[in-house]
Amino acid sequence: MRIISGALKGRSINFLKNVNTRPLKDSVKENIFNILKHSNLIKVKIKSSNILDLYSGIGSFGIECISRGASKVTFIENNLNAVTILKENLIQLSIINRSEIHIKKVENALTNDISEKFHVFFFDPPFKDSSFLQNIKLIQKKKVFKKNHVIII
């Protein structure tokens, strides 16, 4: 798996090789970034943005955001195997200083740890997990979003 674009373009990232997790496909990532870049309706750009990567897994979306100029990415993931790979990737790419990792369930991190405001919220929950709906409500309740923001599911 490689980084698609930006300062880290072409660099490899490690990923988990099991049936319970799946990395975000490059084609999906590219489509998301194209929409963000070219849409007249979305007033958020990745460059200089603060990103919240929820259910982040190995962090491929957040790492791609850093490569494309995001100021900071906050990762939330409770799978310890995925977090181990995520940390390895951030260290290997020398971008650990532009990230923050919360090793817990998304709802716990949102309730107890997250207070800064974000431009981009990226949700990539497990297939059968519908808790993201409650977590969107929690984001609204806590008002941890910038005036111009986007939620991607």
Model feature map: region roles:
Residues 1-153:
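Class I S-adenosyl-L-methionine-dependent methyltransferase catalytic core
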